[in-house]
């Protein structure tokens, strides 16, 4: 039970508007705010920012 509370599953949605999504886990203690990562978007075939969606 404790594992799910500390490291919840989050969706990372592309800011380019393609609708592409990554699914990952995050540590709430280290990252209490929303995550922003620069990852590869295969629809655009380039790296763009992905923001956490709740």
UniProtKB/Swiss-Prot annotation:
InterPro entries: Ribosomal_bL33 (IPR001705), Ribosomal_bL33_CS (IPR018264), Ribosomal_bL33_sf (IPR038584), Ribosomal_zn-bd (IPR011332). One of its GO terms (biological process) is translation. One of its GO terms (molecular function) is structural constituent of ribosome. The lineage of its organism: Bacteria, Bacillati, Actinomycetota, Actinomycetes, Mycobacteriales. It comes from the Bacteria. This is Large ribosomal subunit protein bL33B. Belongs to the bacterial ribosomal protein bL33 family. It comes from Mycolicibacterium smegmatis (strain ATCC 700084 / mc(2)155). It holds the Pfam family Ribosomal_L33. The keyword Ribonucleoprotein applies. Coiled coil: none annotated. GO terms for cellular component: cytosolic large ribosomal subunit. HAMAP family: Ribosomal_bL33 (MF_00294). Keywords: Ribonucleoprotein, Ribosomal protein.
